[in-house]
From Swiss-Prot:
Gene3D superfamilies: Metalloproteases ('zincins'), catalytic domain. This is Endoribonuclease YbeY. The keyword Mitochondrion does not apply. It comes from Helicobacter pylori (strain ATCC 700392 / 26695). Belongs to the endoribonuclease YbeY family. Single strand-specific metallo-endoribonuclease involved in late-stage 70S ribosome quality control and in maturation of the 3' terminus of the 16S rRNA.
């Protein structure tokens, strides 16, 4: 199940994200928060010590029954900019970032694993007919 908190004026169709959430975590709640550049920069600085805006952040919650799996926070203006730059829809860019974030909630870590997150992202991108993700675009 997907809970959405859109704190931006950007409008998007979230049906695809609901389908992705149901595939990745069919019995769990995932919170999606769409925020501004300034807000994600503040979150990144406060919680990670990184004083810059980024595209997506993931925050897993403790394994407490009846609580969400975690939160995926997406920089909506940056997603819109990247979608235009890369020639695909805002919905597709948000879906790519959402997949990336949810995989982190599920324990994947592309900075430490041996390609497992990249492989899982690729499988999901093909299954949902999405363009290349950031992790695939930066692949060697």
């Amino acid at each position: 199940m997907l809970e959405i908190d859109n704190q931006t004026p950007l409008e998007s169709d979230f049906l695809l994200l609901e389908k992705i959430a149901n595939v990745l975590a069919p019995t769990q709640i995932i919170e999606l928060v769409l925020v501004s550049d300034e807000t994600i920069r503040e979150i990144n600085k406060d919680l990670r010590g990184c004083d810059y805006a980024t595209d997506v952040l993931s925050f897993p919650l403790e394994a407490i029954p009846h609580t969400p799996l975690g939160s995926v926070v997406i920089n909506a203006p940056l997603a819109q900019t990247n979608a235009l730059k890369l020639g695909h829809s805002l919905e597709n860019e948000i879906a790519l970032l959402f997949i990336h974030g949810v995989l982190h909630l599920l324990g994947y870590d592309h900075e430490k694993d041996k390609g497992e997150q990249r492989q899982k992202e690729s499988e999901l991108i093909k299954a949902f007919n999405l363009p290349l993700s950031l992790i695939e675009r930066t692949q060697d």
